Curated annotation (Swiss-Prot):
Its main location: membrane. It catalyses: H2 + A = AH2. Its cofactor is [4Fe-4S] cluster; [3Fe-4S] cluster. The lineage of its organism: Bacteria, Pseudomonadati, Pseudomonadota, Betaproteobacteria, Burkholderiales. Residues 1-42 form the signal peptide. [3Fe-4S] cluster binds at C271, C290, C293. Binds 2 [4Fe-4S] clusters. It is a peripheral membrane protein. Pfam families: NiFe_hyd_SSU_C, Oxidored_q6. [4Fe-4S] cluster 2 binds at H228, C231, C256, C262. This enzyme recycles the H(2) produced by nitrogenase to increase the production of ATP and to protect nitrogenase against inhibition or damage by O(2) under carbon- or phosphate-limited conditions. This is Uptake hydrogenase small subunit. GO terms for molecular function: 3 iron, 4 sulfur cluster binding; 4 iron, 4 sulfur cluster binding; electron transfer activity; ferredoxin hydrogenase activity; hydrogenase (acceptor) activity; metal ion binding. Belongs to the [NiFe]/[NiFeSe] hydrogenase small subunit family.
Length: 361
């Protein structure tokens, strides 16, 4: 199988453009310029990796997102970087012909292909709600048997998502509960950001290993910070400036959306840094709060427009009287607590004083 560099040269791409591509790839992955030679070497020497993409219960939004990646472009990822040999949504072949391709790749590249799963397998009724040549739970286990890693695309494969919402009649289940003996990289989101999807694949192909994961199995390079941490509306949150309803003056001023349900403070994703549509925007920038779609169980945690909790802070708009009065109250409470603690400590160290206090009472 050809290397990525050989494919690019065959397509008439110059060495200069190739190195520029490697530099942009390093930037998109958040890597230092010193990694560019490593990326170039990997793309020059390593053959393209076969990818088998299975679909479960889903809406195909992950595929829709993937094909809109700006860097790398989906066409470069599919036609040059990886060898997407099986994807029953995108491939031309169907039926027995498609199944023959799947079997051929599994046998020919045993231990060297990546399994990507979009959607989740249903366990109720022996998996009859999602059937290819066999129920998806068994099909996924069979394809995973000789893969080197599994990528769980989206919140469906990662957590279960809306198919697993209560009462979950199909028993839709995240893929890590069906495939238990392989490393699984979770890329949650409904859907995930396009550049996050292609970035994970690029990292795996470049360094021939899975990216560093957090405790939940998500790549730290994209899921180590809350959306709230880098949100451009964060200064309004800190200042106590909030939208109270979507049609008020504060909404027009671009104030923080926390009080109208934004889940950014509890959601780990790269939306506020990578954004969507080639870095054009993301939901909060468009005026709608984060729904927390990359977090486990978001679909059963109440309305998207309910605030997480009440917060009590002054912000820069608070009056001096309010701040001073509250501060005085806090200081008074602290003095009373300190006095009580001092009495208790003195009595505990002076038995006679304790006896005298008891006799007086």
């Amino acid at each position: 199988m050809e290397t990525f560099y050989e494919v690019m040269r065959r397509q008439g791409i110059s060495r200069r453009s190739f190195l520029k591509y490697c530099s942009l790839t390093a930037t998109s992955l958040g890597l230092a310029p010193s990694f560019v030679p490593q990326i170039a070497h990997a793309m020059e020497t390593k053959p393209r990796t076969p990818v088998l993409w299975l679909h479960g219960l889903e809406c195909t939004c992950c595929s829709e997102s993937f094909i809109r990646s700006a860097h790398p472009l989906a066409k470069d990822a599919v036609l040059s970087m990886i060898s997407l040999d099986y994807d029953d949504t995108l491939m031309a072949a169907a039926g027995h012909q498609a199944e023959a391709i799947l079997d051929e790749i599994m046998a020919k590249y045993k231990g060297n292909y990546i399994l990507a799963v979009e959607g989740n397998p249903p366990l109720n009724e022996d998996g009859m709600f999602c059937i290819q040549r066999q129920a998806l739970p068994r099909e996924a286990q069979a394809v995973a048997a000789d893969c080197k890693a599994v990528i769980a695309w989206g919140s469906c494969a990662s957590w279960g998502c809306v198919q697993a919402a209560k009462p979950n009649p199909t028993q839709a289940t995240p893929i890590h509960k069906v495939i238990t003996d392989k490393p699984i990289i979770k890329v949650p989101g409904c859907p995930p950001i396009a550049e996050v999807m292609t970035g994970v694949i690029t990292y795996m192909l470049t360094f021939d290993r899975i990216p560093e994961l957090d405790r939940q199995g998500r790549p730290k390079m994209f899921y180590s910070q809350r959306i709230h941490d880098k949100c451009y509306r964060r200064p309004h949150f800190d200042a106590g400036q909030f939208v109270e309803s979507f049609d008020d003056e504060n909404a027009r001023k671009g104030f923080c959306l926390y009080k109208v349900g934004c889940k950014g403070p509890t959601t780990y994703n790269a939306c506020s840094t990578v954004m969507w549509n080639e870095g054009t925007s993301f939901p909060i920038k468009a005026g709608h709060g984060c729904t927390g779609c990359s977090e486990d169980g978001f679909w059963d945690k109440g309305s998207f427009y309910d605030r997480l909790t009440n917060i009590h802070q002054f912000g820069i708009e608070a009056s001096a009287d309010k701040v001073g009065g509250t501060a005085a109250g806090v200081v008074g409470a602290a003095i009373a607590a300190h006095a009580a603690a001092s009495v208790i400590k003195r009595l505990s160290h002076d038995p006679d004083a304790a006896a005298r206090a008891e006799s007086r009472s």
